[in-house]
Amino acid sequence: MNLEEAKLKLSKYGQEQILRYYDELSDDEKNALLEQVDKTDMEVLSAIEHKSELVKKGEITPLDAMELDEIKANYDTFKNTGVEAIKAGKVGAILLAGGMGTRLGSDNPKGMYNVGINKELYIFECLINNLMDVVKETETYIHLFVMTSEKNNDVTVSFFKENNFFGYKSEYVHFFKQEMAAATDYDGKIYLEEKGRMATSPNGNGGWYISLKKAGLTQVLENNGIEWLNVFAVDNVLQRIADPVFIGATIEKHCAVGSKVVRKAAPDEKVGVMCLEDGKPSIVEYYELTKEMMDAKNSKGDPAYNFGVILNYLFRVSDLETIVGKNLPLHIVEKKIPYIDADGNLIKPEKPNGYKFESLVLDMIHELDSCLPFEVVREKEFAPIKNATGVDSVETARELLKKNGVAI
């Protein structure tokens, strides 16, 4: 894209401020900015005008989970089916690792955070160790696709190489970058994060399959006959990945997607909850739960909305192609966005000052006809690291790792 073409595009969307410092840039910086303007989807910006209409929930009803007693009763069947699928090369894993460790006080990717006390033990290492348990059990390596972001890709790839992929076979590890979306002020004007660069942020965890596809990695799925993808987040160091019992249960129950869930610690715990929305699987966020929903009971007398999601899903690949063809709902989120002001100074705001645009995994699930909420034991599979201290922190994760026999 040349300068005139960039001016035309920016003029069409009222974003001429992007070129405010163009004349001050080096030739390389100018080319980089023009390329960024070319690649950026600016159609999404119009969504700000319809923000209140964007994501409206339909009728919410409970969705029963497969609970621990049912899993135990069918354990052998589920496990055999899952092991068979893994041995046949039908299972891959997607690690969502685009985030930075900012809230943990680190400038590195979150997965590089050291949770060890007496030795170095990185979040990435914990996850690879968990996946290696299944590799050893099934004597089969599983293709692992690691989604990074523009901001952390190079350092993430280098970190894996420096650590010899934590003992995993490198030919089974594939890196790809998450697509980015522009970040704007409250009037929909895109911020500059540098004089020659628009402010951007990752486009939400619902963009992972489109990003995988754009990176050409769906070819790896086809070439290897991968039919199921276990999608999981970087910040839960205890989660079981490519868990044969979970895979087997989803297959045996003929569900399009499986979702690992934990029993909520309290009715108002800040976790999304599996449900049905207009008869199709969905997730209702904790802040959307009404008192009536929190008090509702199922036929056993247990809370009807009792199982929280832990961002560990199993998707059938054939369904993902269908989902990609549809426009997932757009979520507009208020965030603190560092920006270059009119005087050329970098401002780091103390409170939210604009919007980021995201699509979410929960909207992918809602496009499917069936979902299996699969209960796991919280203390064995849920140790999220969101904060440096307090709830869901490095401290609490360390305690849970120790309880599960992990040397730290």
Where are these regions (language model features)?
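N-terminal glycine-rich phosphate-binding loop and ensuing alpha1 helix
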Residues: L3-H174, A182, E193-P202, G206-Y209, ...
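Hydrophobic/aromatic beta-strand patches that form the interior of the parallel beta-sheet core
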Residues: I94, Y113, F145, H174-F176, ...
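A short linear-motif detector with a strong N-terminal bias
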Residues: K72-N74, V91-A93, F124-E125, N153-T156, ...
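Residues immediately flanking
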Residues: A97-G98, V234, V317-S318
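Short acidic, glycine/serine/threonine-rich loops at helix termini
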Residues: G105-N108, V155-K161, D185-I190, I241-V245, ...
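Conserved beta-loop-beta/alpha segment of the NTase-like Rossmann-fold superfamily
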Residues: F165, S170-E269
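Catalytic core of tubulin tyrosine ligase-like
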Residues: G225-N230, L238-A242, I247-A407
